[in-house]
Amino acid sequence: IQSSSMDQGILTEDSMNSFIRTLIQAGIWKNKVPKQTARTKDGMQTTVKKTEAEADARASQDTRLGFQPIVSVDVELLRQQRRFSSPRVLLSENTPLEPPPLYLTEEPVVLNRTSRRKREGKSHRGEYSVCDSESRWVTDKSSAVDIRGHQVTVLGEIRMGPS
């Protein structure tokens, strides 16, 4: 799945809130402990949740080992969020070959001179980015600070598709 800012509308606060709400409901926001399914003697399924102590012990062990959480994301969840777009985020199953460009280089052909004049200067991308200002891929980052100053965890890998 790929998402690019060229073919999608402007990201509104409502669409971002909707996307975050969907992630929360899917149980993948803020390292939520997943529920596990167990079978009883009569064959019925029950849902068992890990205790907080088990989750905390596992999280501290993972942190000591330098483990970054891996989250499975259903491909259909990402397909539903077509209006989510960012010039700094590309959702794809393939590893990128090179870092994203910092400036838009290709200008679309438009017959309207007024529109062309507005775009004459280089269009700056990522002005309000939540990413570090680096023009290379950062692969060893485990935490970052978002635009509101909150500490967030950077996921090492996101699995898409059936588990």
From Swiss-Prot:
PROSITE patterns, from UniProt?
NGF_2
Per the record, its GO cellular-component terms are: axon; dendrite; extracellular space; synaptic vesicle
Glycosylated residues in this chain: N112
Signal sequence region: 1-3
Return one GO MF term. nerve growth factor receptor binding
Renumbered to this chain, region (Disordered) spans 36-61
Q: Where in the cell is it found?
A: Secreted
What keywords tag this UniProt record? Cleavage on pair of basic residues, Glycoprotein, Growth factor, Secreted, Signal
User: Which residues are propeptide?
Assistant: 4-119
The similarity comment for this entry is: Belongs to the NGF-beta family.
PANTHER family found in the cross-reference section: NERVE GROWTH FACTOR NGF -RELATED, NEUROTROPHIN-3
Q: This chain belongs to which protein, by name?
A: Neurotrophin-3
**Gene field:** NTF3
